[in-house]
Design a protein with these regions (language model features):
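Membrane-interfacial helix-loop-helix modules of multi-pass inner-membrane proteins that assemble, modify
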Residues: 116-119, 130-153, 179-183, 260-269, ...
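A juxtamembrane structural motif centered on a specific transmembrane helix
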Residues: 1-4, 20-25, 368-439
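Interfacial transmembrane-helix termini
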Residues: 5, 23-41, 58-68, 78-99, ...
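Hydrophobic, glycine- and aromatic-enriched re-entrant/interface helices and adjoining loop segments
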Residues: 143-145, 235-329
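Transmembrane alpha-helical segments and their membrane-water interfaces
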Residues: 48-59, 78-127, 159-177, 221-230, ...
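Loop-to-helix entry and N-terminal half of a specific, functionally important transmembrane alpha helix
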Residues: 343-380, 386
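Interfacial loop-to-transmembrane-helix boundary motif in multi-pass membrane proteins
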Residues: 62-70, 88-97, 106-131, 146-148, ...
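Hydrophobic alpha-helical segments of polytopic membrane proteins
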Residues: 182, 186-205, 209-255
């Protein structure tokens, strides 16, 4: 017990020191013009640390590792976003960070009981259908956004956690087979394939092909888990057909991709520096300009480029903070994903769920970072937690909550124990009241 308290205190101190060090670098090396703006930023960062840590003390759970790591990443992100174009407090990003923390707790509470999720999976299908309808009928001319006054929502971001929950399955569901022609498939796997086809078709219709690799990686991860579950009999015929189909789909996608995608695949960015290659050229120049330690917070020039705080945020961080800080920030996200290896899921459903979450984060991070560095064609995908965007931050927070649920799940017998304890407590309180009345 003492060791756990010591570990908790040490983690809190480390968290504060990290944020204080970054704020010190902003004050020393940054372009602090108005001290009041810097004080607002420092107050928001330290205040968010204190308030969230006090909230975590109010309830008990098996692990706080992911809570601390998420809080650390979000406040680092808030400092980054508040320095682009000058030192100021980015109130919009602060609100996004708070919503991300709230979404994390919601994801944890809603997905920790795998039996409840499995029994109510039909409501997840209904939610995905509603998101499809909202994208088709309510977004602005295939721009993927629903605009309400000064706020905008991207429904496709919320499909990711829903799709991962659809991909997760228990051993019972995988053993329930249906014979279709010469193949034996589980009903759950067949529904998964249908949902995946609808998602891919919708992304193609929305011209949001940058998100397709993320959904594709989640789907492939789910198929792999379904083929390799304990005592599974893997059909070589199904594996061969799946591989051939995958190759044919990739060839067709490469040859029949829309014109704007073809330009990104074949463009010479330096030959077309002020055209289709403008963003990537400026991103590469910014990374080279920043070097290892950066030019200082608020001293960069990439803030003038479109999507500097979302699609090419890695390059913007590299310019102002240096490749060292940008790499450490990404490494912190990777370590957060690796906590699953330290405290692995206790059941197969949560194992599949956490595998899907990890696959989604890794693919999305790879697309953003490699695209900013011109190692792959530019996709316009956000970098989890570090890019601006309320919808993306909420979806990422919910996914972290799913990771936390995998580490500290809630089983049916635990639910029954808690109900009995509450009943005993109510009975004890009622007995005390009756005694007081009698006396």
């Amino acid at each position: 017990m003492y060791k756990n308290k010591l570990s908790y205190s040490g983690t809190v101190i480390l968290l504060f020191l990290t944020h204080l060090t970054m704020l010190g670098l902003v004050f020393i090396r940054g372009s602090v013009v108005a001290p009041l703006d810097f004080l607002k930023l420092a107050g928001a960062v330290i205040g968010l640390d204190i308030i969230y840590l006090l909230i975590t003390l109010a309830y008990k759970q098996m692990t706080y590792t992911l809570d601390f790591m998420l809080l650390g990443i979000l406040n680092i992100s808030l400092i980054f976003q508040s320095c682009f174009g000058g030192i100021h407090l980015s109130v919009k990003h602060l609100i996004s960070c708070v919503m991300c923390l709230a979404a994390c707790e919601a994801g944890f509470l809603l997905t920790r009981n795998h039996e409840w999720i499995r029994k109510n999976k039909k409501y997840i299908y209904i939610l995905i259908l509603l998101l499809f309808i909202s994208i088709i009928f309510f977004t602005d001319n295939q721009k993927k956004w629903i605009t309400i006054g000064s706020f905008s929502i991207q429904p496709s971001e919320f499909i990711k956690p829903c799709f991962i929950l659809v991909c997760a399955a228990s051993i019972v569901e995988l053993h329930e087979k249906l014979k279709i022609g010469f193949f034996y498939l589980s009903k759950d796997s067949l529904i998964l394939c249908i949902v995946a086809l609808f998602i891919f078709a919708l992304q193609w219709w929305c011209h949001d092909l940058g998100s397709l690799p993320t959904f594709g990686m989640i789907f492939l991860c789910a198929l792999f888990c379904r083929f390799c579950y304990p005592k599974a009999k893997i059909s070589k015929r199904i594996v061969a057909i799946a591989c051939i189909a995958g190759i044919l789909i990739l060839i067709a996608a490469w040859n029949f991709a829309p014109e704007y995608v073809q330009k990104r695949l074949h463009v010479d960015i330096w030959a077309d520096r002020y055209g289709d290659g403008y963003q990537q050229c400026e991103a590469l120049i910014g990374i080279a300009k920043g070097g290892w330690l950066g030019v200082g917070a608020g001293n960069g020039s990439l803030y003038k480029i479109f999507a500097h705080d979302s699609d090419i945020v890695f390059a913007t961080i590299c310019e102002e903070w240096g490749l060292l800080y940008a790499s450490l920030s990404v490494l912190l996200i990777l370590i957060m994903l690796m906590t699953v290896l330290m405290n692995p899921p206790k059941n197969y459903y949560h194992a599949m769920m956490t595998a899907g979450v990890t696959a989604a984060f890794l693919m999305q991070m790879s697309l953003n970072i490699f695209g900013s560095c011109n190692l792959i064609p530019f996709t316009g995908v956000t970098l989890p937690f570090l890019s601006t965007g309320g919808s993306s931050m909420m979806a990422c927070g919910f996914l972290v909550g799913m990771l936390k649920a995998g580490q500290s799940p809630l089983f049916q017998h635990e639910v029954m124990k808690r109900k009995k304890q509450k009943q005993k407590q109510k009975a004890a309180k009622a007995a005390q009241k009756s005694r007081r009345v009698n006396t």
